[in-house]
Amino acid sequence: VVTLDPAAALAGKLYNRKDISYFITHPCHPSIFNWEPEEEKMKDHFGGNLAKQAIVCSLLQGSEEDYALGEAIARKFYAPVWKAHRITTEQMGLLEPALVETLASTCVFVISEGLKEVIKRGVPAEAARDFLLGHLRIQMAVLFNELPGAVFSDAANKALRRGLNEFIKDDWRKIFEPDNVKEQIIAIT
């Protein structure tokens, strides 16, 4: 049996049968740092069509042969795939929902709301969007080491610290605790 994310497995919603194998996979989607030579490929934001992407794979139960078959199926299903990462089902739950939905989607949503706010306060929409998206690109490149050795300016670091103190709770990492991850999964399944 192939499932397309870890939620059902981690919520205990898969039948407990020892006579079948469970393989879990999910696309990483094309990275924001992915580069494709053709514009049409660059616009394949979800992946599984034209743009290359990585995938994550887990064998919940079964043999190594079952894993190999599952990965081969996943590579075809999500093609073009440039890399398959083998991780545990629990690690996949840390990635989704905790990292990419609960944390990243929330942060990106707040950023998009900030864009709407500066537009509401009079900044021309096109200028605000161009300014934000350009800065997001360089911020992501610095923070994710796409520009080795690059750092934020002193002023940018001061603004970052101020933002962390103003609207990020000190205990935000609790979303990665096993019980919290399970609560997230139960809430969405």
Model feature map: region roles:
Residues 50-54, 120-189:
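NAD(P)-dependent Rossmann-like dehydrogenase/reductase catalytic/cofactor-binding core
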Residues 66-70, 110, 128, 132-135:
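General structural feature for long, well-ordered alpha-helical segments within catalytic domains
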Residues 3-96:
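Rossmann-fold dinucleotide-binding core
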Residues 105-111:
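Short acidic alpha-helix initiation/capping motifs at coil-to-helix transition points
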Residues 96-105:
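A short glycine-threonine-serine/GTX helix/turn-capping micro-motif
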